């Protein structure tokens, strides 16, 4: 009887950990402290958004150690963005637009200077559930790997990700 209870408790703990949202502290990045490089406008998309990129490149790093994550509107309740490498000036595009996030969300993208985790609230490329929360790892100029997704949950459930 006791061994069954212990087993059930262990299974509950393991299940809870598997469902837990990723946390910023689990994706550390070392902040860049050097002089910022000028932004490189090497492709057509970068040249199209040159004004927004140049303006953002003068801001302090705010994401993944050495990047400035810049966003701007692309329609009603829609944003797009890019990460500018302060060390090299290279531009890495966020590979989707974000829209339709819940009204209680004040910022559809959450990020930290000392973390590679990008938390995205809303629909990606105008597809899917607007209440979804997507978690991506930024790895050397690429938002490339979705590491977790939660749907149809209240925003209070995501406080753990903000630590």
Predicted regions and their residues:
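N-terminal secretory signal peptides
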Residues: 21-74
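Acidic, small-residue rich beta-repeat scaffolds with periodic aromatic anchors
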Residues: 21-35, 39, 111-163
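Structural signature of eukaryotic scaffold interfaces centered on beta-propeller domains
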Residues: 56-62, 107-114
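Short coil/turn segments at the loop-to-beta-strand junctions that recur within blades
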Residues: 97-102, 151-154
């Amino acid at each position: 009887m006791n061994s069954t209870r212990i087993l059930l408790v262990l299974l509950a703990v393991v299940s809870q950990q598997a469902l837990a949202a990723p946390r910023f502290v689990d994706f550390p990045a070392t902040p860049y402290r050097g002089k910022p490089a000028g932004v490189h406008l090497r492709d057509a998309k970068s040249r199209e958004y040159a004004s927004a990129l140049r303006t953002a490149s003068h801001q302090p790093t705010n994401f993944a150690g050495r990047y400035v994550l810049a966003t701007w509107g692309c329609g009603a309740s829609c944003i797009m963005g890019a990460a500018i490498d302060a060390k090299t000036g290279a531009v890495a595009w966020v590979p989707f637009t974000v829209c339709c996030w819940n009204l209680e969300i004040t910022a559809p993208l959450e990020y930290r200077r000392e973390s590679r985790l990008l938390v995205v609230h809303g629909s990606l490329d105008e597809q899917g559930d607007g209440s979804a929360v997507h978690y991506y790892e930024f790895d050397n100029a690429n938002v490339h790997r979705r590491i977790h997704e939660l749907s149809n949950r209240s925003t209070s459930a995501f406080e753990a990700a903000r630590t």
